[in-house]
Regions:
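Amphipathic alpha-helical coiled-coil segments
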Residues: 48-53, 111-119
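Acidic/histidine-rich alpha-helical segments that form the ligand environment
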Residues: 65-116
């Protein structure tokens, strides 16, 4: 379970970096703002998840070294939606941790909405 959690946390922290790159390179003000809200928010909620997990199950001992830099923000956020949905079942089922995963999913979903539909 710890390996699944460390991959989950690492992927989400990498998403902050990736969306920061998109934030800097977009020509759209609405996308610029949505991506900025995302990378600020995802670090905070990922940190909350990691600390809650470690408080209950112990410290992480390793993290994956793989890093992927995506090319297109909407497709990337949609892939994060699928990642969180798939990973959820392999993560601890404690309600407090699942609630934090809900917050993560909510942030990804609202950012995807803003990128797709707000101009």
């Amino acid at each position: 379970m710890q390996e699944n959690c460390s991959l989950f946390v690492a992927t989400l922290l990498h998403s902050a970096t990736n969306t920061h790159f998109f934030h800097w390179t977009t020509d759209s003000f609405s996308k610029h703002m949505a991506l900025g809200e995302y990378y600020d928010g995802i670090v905070e909620v990922t940190d909350a998840f990691a600390e809650a997990y470690m408080g209950k199950y112990g410290k992480f001992t390793s993290f994956p070294s793989v890093y992927h830099q995506p090319k297109e923000p909407v497709k990337y956020l949609e892939s994060l939606q699928a990642f969180v949905a798939d990973a959820r079942q392999d993560l601890p089922q404690d309600s407090e941790l699942q609630n934090l995963i809900d917050e993560i999913a909510d942030l990804i979903n609202t950012t995807t909405y803003k990128l797709k539909f707000l101009k």
